[in-house]
From Swiss-Prot:
It holds the Pfam family KYNU_C. Catalyzes the cleavage of L-kynurenine (L-Kyn) and L-3-hydroxykynurenine (L-3OHKyn) into anthranilic acid (AA) and 3-hydroxyanthranilic acid (3-OHAA), respectively. It comes from Bacillus mycoides (strain KBAB4). Its cofactor is pyridoxal 5'-phosphate. One of its GO terms (biological process) is NAD biosynthetic process. This is Kynureninase. Its EC number is 3.7.1.3. Pyridoxal 5'-phosphate binds at T104, T105, F132, P133, S134, D135, D213, H216, Y238, W267, T295. InterPro entries: Kynureninase, PyrdxlP-dep_Trfase, PyrdxlP-dep_Trfase_major, PyrdxlP-dep_Trfase_small. Keywords: Hydrolase, Pyridine nucleotide biosynthesis, Pyridoxal phosphate.
Length: 428
């Protein structure tokens, strides 16, 4: 990384790019000419290696037919476990604790069905009011399946400022009636990183199992689950991990829980050598593979093979180093160039509390996003008034960040956003 103090000049951006140790990975990705893509926290870009691995698995279907389950470069029968092994270094887990399977919401249903056991006074699930809505939908559903009322048995920690959560408030809410905790690792709006190590330790002091939704952190920040002793986690792979739209998700279960039967069992929960014995009594796998349910979505999984190879080469620590540097650069530029335009920084400024994206707040956010798109910049809008921007370490440049800020300054100065309605599109 370039170590010289921040300067708001174009030349400074070019120097940062010149000293970027990850710059060689930029050519791995398909980037549309004339476009600045800053939405990798919502959907990552396609890499050439991800494209190649998808085509390789299509070819294995073409060449081997049903024998593709055990033949070819990437036999389908073992693909979920292989990708779990490649994912493990990104979350600091053991390979056998990690599996690529299903979708984030389905995996939430799996871990809640497995770990939520309301007994006596311990009947409630602890979450928060800022988490992604689908997590809440799944928790409410699982509570109803236990014959309980979500309004009474789902506790949501309140935010003090509408942007972030206080870990002290979360710990204070870990009362004797809490049976299970599910929290985001990084908040999807503000990008705040929760202290997973501290929260896990505090939950375990009280005899509570705790897990995390990593959708906005995996591939962006390091995790150390073995050290922290986290009980379970779920995530998607299509954001920072660039697995493509509908890419298969991931699941982690601490190996100390491998004696626990999955709450939702299915065809691929089986031990591999027993699966085709066709017995009606399940012999569950003795690793995270037990928490699979149905047949792997092979073609939706395929791009992740190539993508995870890139992450293995780049290293999550190096990616985090650049992410912190380039997001700090974006914040400094915004502060220097956009004063007087009524923007508010909605994300934490401290490095240890900031994830991989920047969250700008403005009363005209929806139509500012539309104006940015009309000028070739791809951000995303989050209600009620947020513009999310992710300069991704693998493929975004400092020059792009500099150009983006100049474009936004022009939009605000010329009031170009007034040409658009201030409401979100169907897909924001």
């Amino acid at each position: 990384m370039y170590k010289e103090p921040f300067q708001p000049t174009y030349e400074y951006a070019l120097e940062c790019d010149k000293h970027d140790e990850l710059k060689d990975f930029q050519s791995e990705f398909y980037k549309k000419e004339g476009t600045i893509y800053l939405d990798g926290n919502s959907l990552g870009l396609l890499s050439k290696r991800a494209e190649k691995s998808l085509l390789t698995l299509l070819d294995s279907w073409k060449e081997f037919g049903i024998d593709g389950w055990t033949e070819g470069e990437h036999p389908w029968f073992f693909l979920s476990e292989k990708l779990g092994e490649l994912t493990a270094p990104l979350i600091g887990s053991l390979p056998e604790e990690t599996i690529v399977t299903s979708s984030t919401t389905a995996n939430i249903h799996q871990v809640i069905a497995t770990f939520y056991e309301p007994k006596g006074i311990r009947t409630k699930i602890l979450a928060d009011e800022l988490t992604f809505p689908s997590d809440i939908y799944a928790l409410q559903s699982q509570i109803r399946l236990k014959g309980l009322d979500p309004d009474e048995h789902l506790v949501r920690v309140k935010s003090r400022d509408g942007r972030t959560l206080s870990e002290d408030d979360i710990i204070h809410a870990m009362t004797d009636d809490i049976a299970l905790i599910l929290l985001p690792s990084v908040l999807y709006r503000s990008g705040q990183i929760l202290d997973m190590k501290r929260l896990t330790a505090e939950a375990h002091k009280r005899g509570i199992h705790i897990g995390f939704d990593l959708c906005h952190s995996i591939g962006s920040i390091p995790h150390h689950f073995k050290e922290w002793d986290v009980d379970f986690a779920v995530w998607c792979n299509y954001k920072y991990l660039n697995a493509g739209p509908g890419g298969v998700a991931g699941l982690y279960v601490n190996n100390k829980h491998f004696n626990r039967l999955p709450g939702l069992s299915g065809w691929f929960s089986s031990r591999k050598d027993k699966q085709f014995d066709m017995e009606h009594s399940l012999t569950a796998a003795d690793h995270a593979g037990a928490y699979q349910i149905g047949t792997p979505h092979v073609l939706s999984t395929a791009p992740l093979i190539g993508s995870l190879e890139i992450f293995k080469e780049a290293g999550i620590e190096k990616l985090r180093e650049k992410s912190l540097h380039i997001t700090r650069y974006m914040l400094d530029l915004i502060e220097h160039e956009l004063k007087g335009f009524e923007f508010t920084i909605g994300n934490p400024l401290e490095d240890e509390k900031r994830g991989g994206h920047i969250y700008l707040e403005h009363a005209e956010a929806a139509r500012i996003c539309k104006a940015l798109k009309a000028n070739g910049v791809i951000p995303d809008f989050r209600a009620p008034n947020g513009v999310r921007l992710a300069p991704v370490a693998l493929y975004n440049t400092y020059e792009e960040v500099w150009n983006y800020v100049q474009i936004l300054k022009k939009i605000m100065k010329n009031e170009e956003y007034k040409n658009f309605e201030n409401k979100r599109e169907v897909v924001a």
